[in-house]
Amino acid sequence: SVTGVQTCALPISHPTLDVTFFIMFSTLAAHVCYSLFMEGKMFRALVISTVIVAIAVSAVEQLLRIIGKWVSHRFLNDDRHGDPLSKVYALKKFVDQGWQLVYHCSFSLWEYLLLRKYNWFAGSVIWFSSEETVEAPYAIRLLFIAQISLWFFQAYRHVFVNQRKKDYYELFLHHIVTLSLCYYAQYGNYKLGLIILFLHDNSDIFIDLLKMLNLMKIDGPKDFFIIEIEYVVSLLVWIYERLYTLPITFMRDGIMVMLDHYKGLPMASIFRKEWVFCIEIGCLWILYGLHIYWFILLVRLGYRAFVSEPENIRNISKEGYEGDSDVESDDESPKKNEIGRASCRERV
């Protein structure tokens, strides 16, 4: 602040939500592990995948740390950019977002290749009733297992490692419903699940790039309006893939096909037969609600940054893209920021 006194605008903590979401995720994770263990075939893959994820993320983050420092010092060390990634927290956030970019690019490619291999872009039926015996191809089950291990890892870091941001609870809810969708999709409606995974991972690539460009302070005419163009592209991709294609996919190719399959049965009977699928559709509606919420935030951010307050674009972008609390500073060390947050908690 101007007076030098640190403001204490920490994200509000809700103990009831903390306990509820933690129990929900832990129970679901235990159920997933137990079910895979009892099945036997994929449990070993889950364990190996979780170990690989932990090692790979650590290696990717170390590489991104080196690359980020070098790029910032070599190409952005001027008066306008100010070597942005030389600051401790800016580099940390760049690395955190960078491994997300690597993850989303890798899995988008993996999912795309599987979709092409099995020709699921051709409009074939992608919903199966619970009465049908459907065995998902091993390659697809392996993909879902790898996704599950990543959601285990992300949830652990979200709760126990990362600093809480303003959308902490929204992201926690997102982790819960995504884990549920990944687990149940691998058994029955893996075709629908794979398409939905692809839509999510592919659209996240553009958001990752947007956040990383913002951390590097690449904006304006001298940087060829790169971040401004990326912002527009991110909005368009989000609208098409998450707000348009996603609901059409699970409504037209999921719900409507199910209702047609059980034509003449009352809804209560359909629910008894397909209660798992109905719950997963509920999870998809939760995801869709989160997509609308984040889209509104993204539009508001763009309006403030480019229309109403363009002179404060970097502060607005920092708050919006990165979700910082007011006690976090890019210029301070992690230890100083932790002290600042602790002093705020003592005064709350």
What is the predicted role of each segment?
Residues V2-L10, R345-R347:
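Short, small-residue-biased leader/transition segments that mark boundaries at the very start
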Residues A9-K191, N214-I239, Y244-I286, I296-R341:
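Membrane-helix and juxtamembrane interface regions of eukaryotic multi-pass membrane proteins
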Residues I195:
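Classical protein tyrosine phosphatase
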Residues L199-L210:
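Alpha-helical transmembrane segments and their membrane-interface exit regions
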Residues K211, R242, R345-R347:
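Basic side chains
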Residues Y293:
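Catalytic cores of secreted or luminal carbohydrate-active enzymes
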